[in-house]
Amino acid sequence: MKAAEIREKFLKFFESKGHTIVRSSSLVPGNDPTLMFTNSGMVQFKDVFLGTDPRPYSRATTAQRSVRAGGKHNDLENVGYTARHHTFFEMLGNFSFGDYFKHDAIKFAWELLTTVYQLPKDKLWVTVYQEDDEAYDIWAKEVGVPTERIIRIGDNKGARYASDNFWTMGDTGPCGPCTEIFYDHGPDVWGGPPGSPEEDGDRYIEIWNLVFMQFNRDAQGNMTRLPKQSVDTGMGLERLAAVLQHVHSNYEIDLFQNLIKAAARVTEISDLTNNSLKVIADHIRACSFLIVDGVIPGNEGRGYVLRRIVRRAIRHGYKLGRKGSFFHKLVADLVAEMGVAYPELKEAEQRVTDVLRQEEERFFETIEHGMSILEGALADVEAKGGKVLDGELAFKLHDTYGFPLDLTADVCRERGMTVDEPAFDDAMARQREQARAAGKFKAAQGLEYTGAKTTFHGYEEIAFDDAKIVALYVDGSSVNEVKTGQDAVVVLDHTPFYAESGGQVGDQGVLANAATRFAVADTLKVQADVIGHHGTLEQGTLKVGDVLRAEIDAHRRARTQRNHSATHLMHKALREVLGAHVQQKGSLVDAEKTRFDFAHNAPMTDDEIRRVEQIVNNEILANAPGIVRVMPYDEAVKGGAMALFGEKYGDEVRVLDLGFSRELCGGTHVSRSGDIGFFKIVVEGGVAAGIRRVEAITGDNAVRYVQELDARVNEAAAALKAQPSELTQRIAQVQDQVKSLEKELGALKSKLASSQGDELAQQAVEIGGVFVLAATLDGADAKTLRETVDKLKDKLKSAAIVLAAVESGKVSLIAGVTPDASKKVKAGELVNFVAQQVGGKGGGRPDMAQAGGTEPANLPGALAGVKGWVEERL
């Protein structure tokens, strides 16, 4: 039974039991910012279990895409070297939200395993929590599992309820016992049953975990029964497939074998047991689906994890002798394996391929030199009988050649060596310190300051007359004097300048007296309550102790305040229009615009955007006062003030009431909502799976935007010789004309193809009574290629044909074989023979197949090989 069939049977079985099939959620959790990646089926239902996300169903089933390659759940180092470690895996699960409980969950599992999948009952063992007599009795008395194959697992992790068979969501909250189902591979495989000293062997393999959310645990550790008891189960598709396909390694199942063969093809390796092929086959799944879900290779967070996985795959290809890019060529193979189950993968195929190709090209620019240095260093260490690579060298590889430490450690591990990571960390710390001292300041953090805190007057004033300099910094070092032309950071005892925080940019302005002028380009925090003014001394000298007038750029501040206050109103409006699930995930407020990232799973419609704009502008017209109060945090939240995820708040907080909005905020704002003037959303898009971004403008910027838009509408109307009010109708007419012209063009192409077909027929070569033709048809589209192939088949009577066309760097291929020849020459195999050489893959019927490719430079050679390929099969 193939993996695809196993997945389908699972979902269909639970659908027949009244479950709703729910699509896999994104690998980027939209409801749990504490998670790096979705790593289990229950992640998308966490809020459902907690009762904060009501759904129209009480039973659900999923095949959930999952990744474990960062943070707590990090299997990366073991991937490719063990039978069951993966970065990406599929978790099959069924869920009950206050519906059925232990009886049905256990009976469903047993029926599916023994009846649908037809696993031998005597091969299945189960574990239960030591105190869960209910589950034990269901297994023993109702299901009929012999008691010698039911194992009670106690508190084996050092504390009460700390057990492999007791699940918790956290220190407090929902929790409960679980029961696990194991498959016995038989006495020929080493290992003992769960709970025995030999349980880590491969004989008994856990295939399904059934979690019973039965209790709520409070802060004192007291357990009370939940009013709605729920079920969360998880079964790894790859593990189940290994059992059903009678193999002992997940890498031996059909899905992985096909990917391993594809990896062998692109790396030109014949040994399918090579661990590096397993690494590559695993990593193409994780990388492709992460990119599908909006993760892009980068230097931090999820992007960095993705980059690590990509580079590890590339390094294993390099190890196999592949010195050029190859990894991106596997995307088409993955789509062939998983594109039906996950159509989003097929839809994003080209984007995934492009991202991986770019990352490969970028890394291959550095890997060859870095690898030669690393291999030479390892040889030196081995020659001296050592086992540890110098951390300074590892840092050089990282700093100079972009070689990640984990990749260096991976190479060392294969040679039985380690990296001196403390020495690496020391070198990294020194480099950061040097960069901080040598570079121009972007931030004031890291400056050594031991004086008094800065008193901030910016909520009430735009200038302060008697501000005294208490510290000066040039190039990261404390100085007593700054000279004309120098960049510096100035710390004052009093200031009206707002330091960048909470998404609002820092103020600009001037520090001056009769002899001195310092232009402030940015304001940042040196410490939590110490403000640094970063800029350039344009006139005179500055000394510690000097007294200055500190004056902000009032016009810039006013525009920034308008945008910040509008952000609060927009946040509230988004929650009203889209739902209470909308949470701020990031923001940037400056004088030009407000940029707001928030949790939401779908693009906003035009109607939703208009409604948000209308709500905000109605609040602006109401001209409500901005009321600021300082109060204890708990009191503020209890009073309905919104606290933003990721922000840090002290015991005392600043609460802003502006119209219908109430938020905790330390930023600067308008006095009344009417001061915002006018609000307009100009951009809405996605920045990651489950995260949307809105950019909006206010005041004079918004008015200017509408005026420019109006001017463009008038220009477009003039170009189409219509009034602005007639634009929609006129555009529809133009579109109809274009369609008509395209139809005429298609007819002309068809005629051209027919005439070219007559010429091409004369190029066909007869082999064993079959005419063979492989040629390029200039300017043809896929439809024209198909029509030409059909006409050639009719003309030649007995033929095997491949026609190609190239447009915008992409290759289109069509293969056609007449019925008499298709018994020996399959069109699908023929087109794949050519496609694989031009960076693609395809398929179809024995008589007609199509494919694409991304490497047109290889097309002439690929077509030249068709004659020999066909000749071998006739």
From Swiss-Prot:
Family: Belongs to the class-II aminoacyl-tRNA synthetase family.
Protein name, UniProt field: Alanine--tRNA ligase
Compartment annotation: Cytoplasm
Keywords carried by this UniProt record: Aminoacyl-tRNA synthetase, ATP-binding, Cytoplasm, Ligase, Metal-binding, Nucleotide-binding, Protein biosynthesis, RNA-binding, tRNA-binding, Zinc
Domain of life: Bacteria
GO biological process: alanyl-tRNA aminoacylation; negative regulation of DNA-templated transcription
The enzyme's E.C. designation: 6.1.1.7
Gene transcribed to yield this protein: alaS
Organism: Burkholderia lata (strain ATCC 17760 / DSM 23089 / LMG 22485 / NCIMB 9086 / R18194 / 383)
PANTHER family: ALANINE--TRNA LIGASE, CYTOPLASMIC, ALANYL-TRNA SYNTHETASE
Lineage per the UniProt record: Bacteria, Pseudomonadati, Pseudomonadota, Betaproteobacteria, Burkholderiales
GO molecular function: alanine-tRNA ligase activity; aminoacyl-tRNA deacylase activity; ATP binding; tRNA binding; zinc ion binding
Binding positions (Zn(2+)): 564, 568, 665, 669
Enzyme class: ligase
